[in-house]
Structure formats: structure tokens, C-alpha cells
């Protein structure tokens, strides 16, 4: 699954590293004399050509450029240093630069090409040679402005760089950065020489010095010894040339690792190895809070191991902790979910371990250069070097490349590359793995088994969604689901959602539909647990909710009713249970199952109806699903088919089922952050064409499910008899327009004889309600509103006028000027002459203009109403119930152009004339001073402001 190639940074041919000419997965540098000797070998020529055509470095030679340096001589010097001195500290300073600190104080900077794994430049720094406070260096850390060295005594060497390196790439000489070096004596035991270790925080202003604990050892009592000297963990603050002690602590057990929390730099997390009196070994994770000069332990977690811990590492995001023991057992502890996974008896002893920079993969190795990679579920990842054959294996053995097997000291992945600094169109790389051997050589493994610098959520690397996608391509969906289950929705929500979608597409569109895949999909959906935070649920619940609905209908198409019922209980939507009922009612063996599904649907309706405050089911109950699609005529035909009314619960139950399953579904509503309702423009019908809203009566809540279905049957059968239109059509005023979601005008429906409509009011009188019939269409008069032309509150509704008064008002109304007229040079209107003293014209005949027939108003600012939060069910929020058809609510929801949706239509109604208008200055009443002036401009007409928005 992972593809890589190894570059050995050495020029020694047969003395240390032995690589065959046919091996295209391992490389080493050739000297000029080696090149001349291999001219006769065609395989060597082909491999060298293969390397150079890919911008690789095959033959090492000195360059005349000063910036590049003498690379061949520097590499030879590096190999001599590796044989003579120990490496105290090694780290990746960025994605393409390695820093090595040797025991005598020399620093080596190695610049690496991330696309090939070759050395670009090498610089040696000798500033610290001869300036050490002690002979043995145990640890060090390097920041942009400080270098701190620790020894096996209670001393520190601090180098302050007053002019840090301003170069974006490449190292800089310490002497050019104005260094200031000083030595500090820190608290601690002076009688014993213990190795001091250093850890710095992300802000580079606090660091920790820690050693082994000595609580189990016997100390000679002295009255002058302090608690600071007995403590083994010390926290210091560094700023410029000042070093200040902040806090200290004496741990109960020997710490293996001490680090600062990334989320809070005032907290420290430690990993300690505890050995009980019985000899049981466990790992304890402790967190400390820095307060008032002391370290207070706030939490502790114990992980049983059973054997001595030989390798450990926190993930870069500090959510996972890897532990390996000498008995070949490994475990992965989740610090967020507080869960631990174990893998017993792996194939190698995990002496070294390293996390990938994306925190989705880790690599373990033994001392003989045998590597093994694991994902977040502790499943082995196949790994192989570049070859002509596809031979992935769980183990990658590099030991056969060495003549004398060296000891592998450490492995370390490079940091995440900054894509802005690397511009390459076709090259691919995921990371570099540095292998440090005792007495050399150094090796660099370039892994490009991922998607390169594009394709995943972070645009580079081996993230969890990339690994899961590779598992799906290899027909291993169980491993992909395990990776998803190991992710945390709180911190990697987007990555979890992408992985969940990939698994869903694999299940829905896979060639062979097997039951194990369906079980894996159900398990993947359960990773979005109800225990997540409200912020995470609000952000991802809609997408997960849609996937659950898709999966439920997928199960229905496969006739897997039991699994679909389980998902339907989690989704809790009415239409899914009705689809289950419609599909299983005709199967005799599933009759009880159908009744349970029907009762679940009725219970959901009753629950949501009670939550909405509307306990009457006389309104239309319609489904959302296309599986239960029907028309109103089908419902009427189903009601008219009955020849005689029946009484009792047993008679009303089939009728209620027939009515409940034949409702017309409205348009599906959805909630999206990208495409919302405010982007939809809807043409509002005129008030004259809009029918009145039906009045719905309020009935007391039913006491049982049986009475609920009986009540719904009686109410729905009474509605047609009392809703007859004078033209003979049934339900002519409450049939919604399914194309727009708004009530439409009366449309012709199939006429039914009155004898086909049974009258059940006598039999079911105790359950019947008295719904008020809507007023006739002929007597319906829309009420108009008048809005002022200035910003303010909208006045209350005004009384309507009779037709005679309305005509009188129209005759008395004076026409106003058009807003499109030019006030600087107005045209003569209404028989008036322009106010020009030099020229007079005869009066013209009155003309009807567009501005004289329309009056418009400015919609004033209306305080926005706080929208209620959607109801939460099963731990996540989703859109409100959409199967209950409320015409008034649907009309308000479909008008997003103005925020007070319930008062939206009044802003577009014609303005009545019985309201006192603002005074209009007529031209006859204008002062004569306007015409006495010498200007030729006429008096400006009064113009009404038009604005179809909110002021």
C-alpha cells in the first residue's frame, strides 16, 4: 500500500552498503572513479540514467559554486564525524532541513530535496566547540532565538541569538547572528550525575528540565537541602538573557516523557512508568497545572503494560499515545476518548517509533532496520520499495543492504511541508523518514504512497481519509471503518465526514451487495455518537442525517426490513415508517412488523403535533417520501369506495390506515450552509387570486394510539363533506401547489356524486370536531395596508371600504408625478403650462401615465424576530417535521425575501385611499416667489420614493 525508496547518504561502495544494480528502490552516491569503473555495466548505466532523468543525484562531485559548497568533501567529513562522535540530538527543523548535534558540540545542517531525498547542501557549525560547561551533553533544543544545552550535571548552557536568521531557506552561521553565551546552575542533586532532558513549548518561552525520579532511593538527610534540589521536574521561563524558575515537582515514578500541552501551555503532560511491589508494570499519564510556583497534578490515567516499555511517542496532535514493550506488545491510547487498543505479539520488537506528521500513521522499527507501519486502528499497512513487481508486505527489511549490520538509533518523520515554498507540477512526495545508525551511515526514505501534494483534505500527506480511501480501493472496507472509528469527530469532523461519504459510496455503488458491507455501513454511521458536543452536532448532523436516510431507503430496496427499521428508529422520520408499512403490509409473514411500523409513524405524528402545539389531525398529513406518493383523487376514490359506514375500532383501523398512507408529499425542504432559501426568488401571486386559508379547529389530545388513528379517520372523512365549493369541486381551497409550495387557485378535480360520500357523523359523533368552513369566495375581500413613506412602525390594519366609497376616493385622488421624470426640466402635464415667463403654451389634454396608476411605499424597518431553534431528536438537530401540511406555515417558509414572513404579503398590497396622505404641494398653491425669479426652471413636482426593500 505504501510505496517508497531509500537513499543512503554515503559514498562507500562495498564497505558498508551493498546495493544491486537492478534494485530501483535503493540508492547510494557514486564517486567519479566508481563511475568510470561501471561504464561497462549496462545495468548500472541504466539505473544512473533512471536517477538523473528524475532530477536525482547519482554521481557525487564538488561544485564550484560557493552556495552549494563542496558536497563530496562535506559528505566524507560527515561520515568521519559519525564514526568518531555520538549524535546527541537530531531533528527536522522543517520539511527539508535536518539538524544534527554531536557530542563535542559540532552542529551539522543538511538541506534535503523533498522530491528526490538527495542532499542539496551541508553546513557545519563549530561555534559551540570548546565552549561547553561540561564534558557530556545529554540533550538540547534549538529555537529561532535561543540554543539551550543540558548536561549530566545541574548546569545549562544558553546561547541567545540577538539577530535571528532572517533567511527563508538554508542555515546561517551562529557568529553572524550576534550570539551571547552564558552558563546557568539550576537546582538539583549535585552528588549524582543524571542525564537531563529538555522540552520546549510551542511559544519558545517556557521549557522543562527533567531527570529520573529518586523517591524510591535513600538520601542522606541534611538540613541544608531544599525541595527544589529533590525535585526532578523543573520549569523555566526564558526571555532574552534572563532565565527564571517558574515551578518544580517531584514525580512519584520515573518519567519517560514530559511535554507541554498544545491546547494550553500552562499545563504539562507526563508519561511515567510505574512498577508495583508485585512487579506489575504500567504506564501512567499525568497532567500538571502550573500555578503559584508549583505543579499541581490534576489528572492521572493508568495503562497496564505487563512488560518494560521500550518505545513511546505522543502523536503530533497529542490525541494518541503509542506504547511498545519488550515482549512485542503494543498499544494505542486515545487521550480524548479515553480508550486503549492493544495488538499482541507483533513481528518485531518495537525499539524505535515515530509518528507521521498527519497523526494518522506511525512507524516502528527494531535495531536491525526492520520497519512496520500501523494505522490508527493498529492494523498493519503494506509497505514495499519501488520495484518492477508488486510485492507489498507488512514488514520492510533493510538489513540486507548492510555488510555489517549497524544498530538503528532513531527514526523520525519530516514535518509537514509548506506548499507555498515548494512549486512543482508533477512531483509527488508525502514525507521523508530519517534513519540514524550508530557510527553511520544516514539514510532517508522518501514515501510517496499517498496522493502527493494534492487530493486530500490537507493537500499533502497521508491523512486518515487518504488511508481509508486506499483501503476501499483494495476491497478492505472493514479497515476503512476501523480508521473512521478511531477518528475524533470533535477535532477531525470534516475528515470524518469525508471518510463516511467514501464508505457510503463504496456500499451504495459497489458491484456485489453483501450483508457484511451493510453491517459495516451501519457501524460507520454509529461513529457519529449522541455524546458529541452540541457544536459538532449542529455542524455535521444534517449531512449525517441525509446519509442515514439514503442508507435506510437503500435497505428498503434490498428488502432488508429489519435493518431498515433499526435505522428508521434512529432517524425518527414519519415517511420511512410509512414506506416500511407499505412494503410489508402485503407480506403475510410480516403483518405484525407492518403494524409496528404503522404505530411508530402514528406515534411520531402525535409527538411532533404535541410539540408544535397543534393537537388536531384534521389537517392534511402528507409524507415526504416518493415511495408513498399519491394524489388527492386517489384519496377521494379510496373514501368513496366504501358503501356502508362501519362502526367500532376494528372497522375504523383499516380506513385510517388507508387514509394515513395516501397523503401527497410536499416539496422536500433542506438546510444547507451554501444554498439557502434566501437565494430563491419566488413570484408571489396577487391577493385577488389567493384563496383564504382554511381554519383548523383545536381538539383535545387523544389518550391512546387507537383513538388517534380513529380520530384522524373521522376528521378526514368529514372534511370533504363540509368543504364543497359552489362549483362542485372538492377541497378547492386547500390543495397545495406541489411545484412551488404555495396554495393555488381552485383547480378542477374529478367530480364525485354526493351519494358516494358516506356520512359518519352519527356513528363517530364522540370523536368528530366542528371545523369552521371558510367564507365563500364571492364574499371574500382582501384587507389592505397602508405604509408610511418614511421609516417607522407599520400601523394597524384599517377597515375595508365599500365599492362606492372606493370609487369616490379614486376620483378625488390627485395624480402624482412619475419617479422617472426629470425634475430639472419637467414636461407639461394635466393641462398646466410650464412656469417659464418668456414662453407660454396652450393647455394639453390630460394623459394617463404609468405613475398615475400605481402607488408604492417604502417598506419600513421591522425588528427581526428570533427564530426558534429546530427541535433536537436522538442527540442531533435536524429540520423540523415536514409531513404536517400547514398552509400558513408553508407560505411563510417559502417567502424569505423579507424577514417578517407572517406579515410579508401586506407590503405588496394596493394602498387604500382612506388614509391621510402626506401633504402634496400643488402647483397652484406654490408661492409666487418661485415664478418671479430669473431662472427658467419650473417648480419640482412631488415625487414618491420607490424602494422595494427594507430602509
UniProtKB/Swiss-Prot annotation:
Name of the protein in its database record: WD repeat-containing and planar cell polarity effector protein fritz
UniProt record, GO biological process: cilium organization; establishment of protein localization; imaginal disc-derived wing hair site selection; nervous system development
Low complexity compositional bias, start-end: 930-942
Region (Disordered): 709-776, 816-883, 903-951
Gene3D superfamilies reported in the protein's UniProt record: YVTN repeat-like/Quinoprotein amine dehydrogenase
GO CC annotation terms, alphabetical: axonemal basal plate; cytosol; plasma membrane
UniProt entry keywords in alphabetical sequence: Cell membrane, Cell projection, Cilium, Cilium biogenesis/degradation, Cytoplasm, Cytoskeleton, Membrane, Repeat, WD repeat
Alphabetical list of InterPro entries matching this protein: Frtz, WD40/YVTN_repeat-like_dom_sf, WD40_repeat_dom_sf
Amino acid at each position: 500500500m505504501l510505496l517508497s525508496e531509500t537513499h543512503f547518504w554515503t559514498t562507500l561502495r562495498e564497505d558498508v552498503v551493498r546495493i544491486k544494480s537492478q534494485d530501483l528502490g535503493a540508492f547510494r552516491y557514486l564517486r567519479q572513479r566508481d563511475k568510470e569503473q561501471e561504464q561497462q555495466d549496462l545495468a548500472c548505466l541504466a539505473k544512473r540514467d533512471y536517477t538523473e532523468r528524475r532530477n536525482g543525484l547519482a554521481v557525487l562531485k564538488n561544485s564550484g559554486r560557493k552556495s552549494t559548497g563542496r558536497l563530496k568533501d562535506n559528505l566524507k567529513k560527515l561520515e568521519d564525524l559519525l564514526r568518531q562522535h555520538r549524535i546527541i540530538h537530531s531533528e527536522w527543523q522543517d520539511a527539508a532541513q535536518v539538524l544534527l548535534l554531536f557530542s563535542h558540540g559540532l552542529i551539522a545542517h543538511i538541506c534535503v530535496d523533498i522530491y528526490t531525498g538527495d542532499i542539496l547542501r551541508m553546513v557545519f557549525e563549530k561555534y559551540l566547540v570548546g565552549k561547553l560547561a561540561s564534558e557530556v551533553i545529554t540533550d538540547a533544543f534549538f529555537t529561532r532565538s535561543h540554543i539551550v544545552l543540558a548536561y549530566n550535571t545541574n548546569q545549562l548552557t544558553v546561547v541567545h541569538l540577538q539577530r535571528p536568521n532572517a533567511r527563508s531557506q538554508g542555515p546561517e552561521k551562529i557568529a553572524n547572528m550576534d550570539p551571547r553565551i552564558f552558563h546557568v546552575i539550576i537546582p538539583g542533586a549535585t552528588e549524582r550525575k543524571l542525564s537531563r532532558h529538555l522540552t520546549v513549548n510551542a511559544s519558545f518561552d517556557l521549557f522543562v528540565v527533567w531527570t529520573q525520579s529518586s523517591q524510591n532511593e535513600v538520601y542522606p538527610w541534611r538540613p541544608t537541602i531544599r525541595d527544589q534540589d529533590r525535585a526532578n521536574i523543573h520549569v523555566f521561563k526564558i526571555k532574552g538573557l534572563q532565565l527564571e524558575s517558574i515551578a518544580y515537582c517531584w514525580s512519584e515514578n520515573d518519567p519517560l516523557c514530559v511535554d507541554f500541552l498544545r491546547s494550553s501551555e500552562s499545563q504539562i503532560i507526563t508519561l511515567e512508568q510505574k512498577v508495583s511491589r508485585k512487579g506489575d508494570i504500567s504506564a501512567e499519564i499525568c497532567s500538571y497545572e502550573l500555578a503559584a510556583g508549583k505543579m499541581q497534578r490534576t489528572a492521572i490515567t493508568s495503562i497496564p503494560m505487563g512488560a518494560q516499555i521500550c518505545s513511546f511517542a505522543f502523536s503530533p496532535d497529542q490525541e494518541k499515545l503509542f506504547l511498545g514493550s519488550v515482549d512485542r506488545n503494543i498499544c494505542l491510547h486515545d487521550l480524548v476518548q479515553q480508550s486503549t487498543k492493544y495488538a499482541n505479539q507483533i513481528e518485531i520488537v518495537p525499539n524505535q517509533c515515530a509518528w507521521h506528521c498527519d497523526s494518522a500513521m506511525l512507524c516502528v522499527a527494531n535495531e536491525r532496520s526492520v520497519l512496520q507501519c500501523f494505522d490508527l486502528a493498529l492494523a498493519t499497512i503494506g509497505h514495499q520499495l519501488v520495484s518492477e513487481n508488486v510485492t507489498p508486505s507488512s514488514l520492510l527489511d533493510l538489513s540486507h543492504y548492510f555488510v555489517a549490520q549497524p544498530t538503528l538509533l532513531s527514526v523520525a518523520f519530516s514535518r509537514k511541508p509548506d506548499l507555498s515554498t515548494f512549486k512543482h507540477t508533477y512531483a509527488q512526495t508525502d514525507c521523508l523518514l530519517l534513519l540514524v545508525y550508530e557510527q553511520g551511515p544516514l539514510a532517508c526514505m522518501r514515501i510517496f504512497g499517498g496522493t502527493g501534494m494534492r487530493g486530500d483534505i490537507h493537500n499533502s500527506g497521508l491523512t486518515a481519509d487518504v488511508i481509508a480511501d486506499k483501503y476501499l480501493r483494495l476491497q478492505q472496507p472493514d479497515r476503512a471503518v476501523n480508521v473512521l472509528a478511531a477518528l475524533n469527530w470533535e477535532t477531525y469532523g470534516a475528515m470524518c465526514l469525508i471518510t463516511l461519504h467514501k464508505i457510503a459510496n463504496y456500499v451504495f455503488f459497489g458491484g456485489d451487495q453483501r450483508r457484511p458491507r451493510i453491517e459495516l455501513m451501519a457501524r460507520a454511521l454509529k461513529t457519529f455518537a449522541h455524546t458529541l458536543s452540541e457544536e459538532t452536532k449542529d455542524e455535521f448532523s444534517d449531512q449525517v442525517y441525509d446519509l442515514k436516510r439514503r442508507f435506510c431507503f437503500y435497505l428498503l430496496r434490498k428488502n432488508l426490513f429489519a435493518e431498515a427499521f433499526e435505522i428508521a428508529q434512529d432517524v425518527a422520520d414519519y415517511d420511512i415508517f410509512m414506506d416500511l408499512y407499505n412494503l410489508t403490509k402485503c407480506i403475510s409473514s410480516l403483518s405484525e412488523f407492518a403494524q409496528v411500523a404503522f404505530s411508530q409513524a402514528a406515534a411520531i405524528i402525535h409527538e411532533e403535533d404535541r410539540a408544535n402545539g397543534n393537537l388536531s389531525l384534521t389537517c392534511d398529513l402528507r409524507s415526504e417520501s416518493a415511495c408513498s406518493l399519491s394524489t388527492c383523487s386517489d384519496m377521494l376514490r379510496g373514501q368513496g369506495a366504501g358503501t356502508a359506514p362501519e362502526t367500532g375500532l376494528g372497522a375504523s383501523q383499516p380506513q385510517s390506515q388507508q387514509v394515513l398512507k395516501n397523503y401527497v408529499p410536499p416539496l422536500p425542504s433542506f438546510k444547507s450552509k451554501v444554498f439557502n432559501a434566501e437565494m430563491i426568488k419566488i413570484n408571489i401571486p396577487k391577493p385577488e387570486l389567493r384563496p383564504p386559508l382554511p381554519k383548523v379547529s383545536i381538539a383535545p389530545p387523544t389518550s391512546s394510539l387507537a383513538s388517534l388513528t380513529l380520530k384522524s379517520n373521522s376528521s378526514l372523512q368529514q372534511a370533504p363533506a363540509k368543504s364543497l365549493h359552489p362549483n362542485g369541486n372538492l377541497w378547492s381551497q386547500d390543495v397545495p401547489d406541489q411545484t412551488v409550495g404555495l396554495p393555488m387557485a381552485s383547480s378542477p378535480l374529478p367530480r364525485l356524486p354526493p351519494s358516494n360520500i358516506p356520512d359518519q357523523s352519527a356513528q363517530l359523533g364522540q370523536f368528530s370536531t366542528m371545523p369552521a368552513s371558510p367564507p365563500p369566495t364571492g364574499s371574500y375581500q382582501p384587507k389592505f395596508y397602508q405604509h408610511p413613506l418614511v421609516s417607522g412602525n407599520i400601523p394597524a390594519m384599517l377597515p375595508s371600504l365599500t365599492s362606492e366609497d372606493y370609487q369616490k376616493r379614486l376620483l378625488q385622488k390627485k395624480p402624482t408625478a412619475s419617479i422617472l421624470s426629470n425634475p430639472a426640466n419637467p414636461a407639461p402635464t394635466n393641462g398646466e403650462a410650464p412656469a417659464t415667463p418668456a414662453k407660454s403654451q396652450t393647455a394639453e389634454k390630460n394623459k394617463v401615465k404609468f405613475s398615475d396608476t400605481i402607488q408604492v411605499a417604502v417598506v419600513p424597518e421591522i425588528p427581526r424576530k428570533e427564530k426558534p431553534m429546530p427541535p433536537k431528536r436522538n442527540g442531533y438537530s435536524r429540520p423540523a417535521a415536514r409531513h404536517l401540511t400547514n398552509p400558513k406555515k408553508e407560505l411563510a417558509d417559502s417567502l424569505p425575501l423579507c424577514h417578517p414572513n407572517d406579515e410579508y404579503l401586506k407590503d405588496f398590497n394596493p394602498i387604500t385611499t382612506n388614509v391621510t396622505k402626506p401633504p402634496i404641494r400643488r402647483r397652484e398653491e406654490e408661492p409666487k416667489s418661485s415664478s418671479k425669479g430669473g431662472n427658467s426652471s419650473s417648480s419640482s413636482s412631488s415625487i414618491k420614493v420607490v424602494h422595494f426593500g427594507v430602509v
